[in-house]
């Protein structure tokens, strides 16, 4: 199992709405994330910079790349687009983060 982390950007003033939408995550999206191999998924917010930091675990045989091809993922991205920085294809702009320390 591999742990990865990445950064996204939340638009100023959108904190509460971002939390509200994630508190009511669509069951079919949660199922799709799990089916792709994602587990122990956390998203943290730095309120000063509006950066979101996501951390998740995935197995070697994950299918995360295929999520972009699913209807539910595309609908979620469209639903969230007014809250965060997105690319031309509608997906959130993500910056992979390099692990610097781990204590087990």
Swiss-Prot record:
Can you tell which superkingdom this protein's organism belongs to? Bacteria
Task: Output one GO MF annotation.
Answer: L-rhamnose mutarotase activity
Quote the Gene3D superfamilies the UniProt record gives: 3.30.70.100
Keyword check for Transferase, yes or no.
Answer: no
Where it sits in the cell: the answer is: Cytoplasm
Q: Which residues form the active site?
A: 22 (proton donor)
Keywords from the UniProt entry: Carbohydrate metabolism, Cytoplasm, Isomerase, Rhamnose metabolism
The EC number(s) this enzyme carries: 5.1.3.32
Q: GO CC: one term?
A: cytoplasm
> Alphabetically, which GO biological process terms does the record hold?
rhamnose catabolic process
Please list the residues that bind substrate.
18, 41, 76-77
Q: What does this protein do?
A: Involved in the anomeric conversion of L-rhamnose.
Q: How does it assemble?
A: Homodimer.
The family annotation for this protein states: Belongs to the rhamnose mutarotase family.
Could you tell me what this protein is called?
L-rhamnose mutarotase
State the species of origin. Answer: Burkholderia cenocepacia (strain HI2424)
Gene encoding it?
rhaM
């Amino acid at each position: 199992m591999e742990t990865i982390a990445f950064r996204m950007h939340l638009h100023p003033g959108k904190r509460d709405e971002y939390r509200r939408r994630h508190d009511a995550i669509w069951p079919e999206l949660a199922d799709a994330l799990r089916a792709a191999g994602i587990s122990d998924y956390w998203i943290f917010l730095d309120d000063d910079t509006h950066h979101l930091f996501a951390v998740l675990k995935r197995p070697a045989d994950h299918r995360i790349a295929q999520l972009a091809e699913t209807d539910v993922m595309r609908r979620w991205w469209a639903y969230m687009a007014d809250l965060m920085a997105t690319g031309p294809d509608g997906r959130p702009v993500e910056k992979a983060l390099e692990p610097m320390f781990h204590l087990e």
